[in-house]
């Protein structure tokens, strides 16, 4: 099912983050929760989870999946709009991005996440979507995202979803896991900003 994360994706997230969270109290922002299956895993791994979705109904479902975990905060909002100012005043160590898969939206989500200086780790779902791949590739080329690795189904280059095209989608995994790189060559984000010209 392309609409939710696979067990392998969730296992790879846990394997990556558990060693870090064993010695530190880390916070993750999950952007796009759908039914909350990944949210439940993140709640078991992280000290604090901030789950954001534009659909209130998805947040209600996610709340049921997490069985009322006290370490999960649910927020309704459009992650593409620059409402990350609230996050900038908090310590967020990791971001899981699985919201709107259009190129411009993923670009905005990554830019907004990079504006939170404490974010060191990025996980992306639906890497098979062209907009997701293109946006991540641009940040990798700039050096803003480094040490990226494939996670979830297809991490080994195997076919894993209906519609998989062996000629154009070799080595396309379900997700991608990256670390923050040097940001010296990143231009500021002007997505969803208002300008007045006089």
Model-derived regions, located:
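A short alpha-helical cap/connector motif
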Residues: 1-96, 100-198
């Amino acid at each position: 099912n392309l609409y939710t994360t696979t067990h392998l994706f969730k296992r790879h997230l846990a394997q990556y983050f558990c060693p870090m969270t064993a010695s530190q109290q880390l916070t993750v922002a999950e952007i796009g929760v759908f039914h909350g299956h990944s949210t439940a895993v993140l709640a078991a791994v992280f000290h604090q989870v901030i789950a954001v979705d534009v659909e209130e109904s998805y947040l209600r479902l996610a709340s049921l999946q997490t069985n009322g975990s006290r370490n999960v905060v649910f927020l309704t909002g459009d992650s593409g709009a620059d409402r990350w100012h609230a996050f900038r005043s908090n310590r967020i160590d990791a971001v899981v991005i699985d919201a709107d898969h259009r190129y411009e939206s993923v670009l905005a989500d990554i830019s907004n996440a990079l504006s939170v200086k404490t974010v060191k780790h990025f996980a992306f779902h639906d890497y098979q979507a062209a907009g997701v791949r293109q946006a991540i590739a641009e940040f990798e080329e700039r050096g803003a995202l480094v040490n990226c690795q494939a996670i979830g189904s297809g991490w080994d280059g195997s076919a894993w979803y209906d519609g998989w095209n062996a000629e154009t989608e070799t080595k396309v995994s379900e997700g991608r896991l990256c670390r923050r790189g040097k940001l010296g060559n990143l231009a500021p984000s002007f997505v969803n900003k208002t300008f007045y010209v006089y």
